[in-house]
A protein has these predicted regions:
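Conserved protein kinase catalytic core
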Residues: 50, 97, 183, 210-212, ...
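C-terminal, non-catalytic tails of nucleotide-sugar-dependent glycosyltransferases
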Residues: 278-300
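Active-site acidic catalytic loop and adjacent metal/ATP-binding pocket
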Residues: 27-35, 42-43, 161-215
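An alpha-helical support segment within catalytic cores of ATP-dependent transferases
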Residues: 4-14, 125-176, 186-189, 196, ...
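ATP-binding glycine-rich phosphate-binding loop
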Residues: 13-36
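A conserved alpha-helical element in kinase catalytic cores
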Residues: 41-82, 104-122
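Conserved short submotifs of the Hanks-type protein kinase catalytic core
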Residues: 85-97
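Active-site activation/catalytic loop segments of kinase-like enzymes and analogous catalytic loops
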Residues: 214-243, 252-271, 281-286
Length: 300
């Protein structure tokens, strides 16, 4: 039976919104399945009044509006309704997340790897409306902050500063948060043959913006690559072919130091910390060596 959770405004029914199932509720947001004026819909409602998350919510709304004005080269849910404050009503997409864990425990098959990488590559190559996007964060500030927190040595920071000086301004559009849970897969049937055709749908655009080349790849390399070595191999090939070694090494460092912080902040007996922290530490050891090597090499 349809109902409105107490978190949602009482006016939901007056705009033709009904809620069938609450899919997930965190301290930040409520995600539900329902219908909007007879059309299946996903409902995302901001619970946390923190100004940071309010700003991210407004940013995600802006991204959906950009996509409504200028069609992106990747599949996204359509924006059906918003109250411009806390409520997003989106087209319901029949697809499943790549995984629910931040670090998936299953290995992706070749079809899934191809679909994910093709999707991210298409987004990165898109000629986006330049006036509508800006850098998601300041790389120099991020590096300084993580050194102050103890996640970077002086030598590592110097290497990162050296690469930053080479890379120029962030100008590549990236999703910004391609967690496995934000990558939905929908295996349909191809019109030309009997094989299943895997479509990727990207959701949660709160951190979308301009980055140095390869940020999304750095996240996939770190998280999905932990259980799927072939995606790391494919990403390394893309990095080499496109000549973005310095930017990618920088992005890896940014991603991995954040992962170290997030997992060190978990309780010591937390199962996720116990499982993932050794993976992250091993990846950071390798990435740090790579960083120093590239920083020491003379630019071509």
């Amino acid at each position: 039976m349809s109902h409105t959770p107490p978190d949602l405004p009482g006016s939901a029914a007056t705009i033709g919104l009904t809620i069938d199932t609450v899919l997930r509720r965190t301290d930040k947001t409520l995600l539900a399945r329902g219908s909007f004026r007879g059309e299946p819909a996903a409902v995302k409602y901001l619970i946390d009044p923190d100004p940071f998350w309010a700003a991210r919510w407004r940013h995600e709304l802006n991204v959906y509006e950009v996509f409504g004005d200028t069609t992106p080269p990747v599949r996204i849910p359509r924006l059906l309704h918003t109250d411009r404050d806390r409520l997003l009503v989106l087209e319901w997409v029949d697809a499943s997340p790549l995984a629910v864990e931040r670090y998936p425990q299953r290995e992706l098959d070749t079809r899934e790897v191809n679909a994910v990488l093709d999707c991210i590559t298409a987004l990165n190559a898109w000629t986006y409306p330049a006036a509508r996007f800006s850098p998601t964060f300041d790389y120099s500030e991020r590096v300084a902050r993580y050194q102050a927190k103890g996640y970077l040595t002086e030598g590592q920071r110097e290497a990162l500063d050296s690469l930053l000086a080479r890379c120029g301004a962030p100008a590549q559009l990236n999703h910004g948060d391609p967690l496995a849970s934000n990558i939905l897969l929908n295996a349909g049937r191809s019109d030309s043959d009997d094989e299943a055709e895997t479509t990727v749908v990207l959701v949660d655009w709160e951190f979308t913006g301009l980055f140095l080349p390869g940020f999304d790849f750095a996240m996939l390399h770190t998280q999905v690559g932990a259980s799927t070595p072939v995606i790391r191999e494919r990403i390394e090939a893309i990095v080499s072919e496109t000549g973005i070694e310095a930017a990618f090494a920088l992005n890896l460092a940014v991603v991995l130091t954040r992962e170290l912080r997030l997992h060190h902040e978990l309780p010591e007996d937390d199962p996720t910390r116990k499982r993932c922290l050794p993976i992250i530490e091993a990846a950071w050891t390798s990435a740090s060596t790579r960083l120093q090597r590239i920083a020491a090499a003379r630019p071509a």
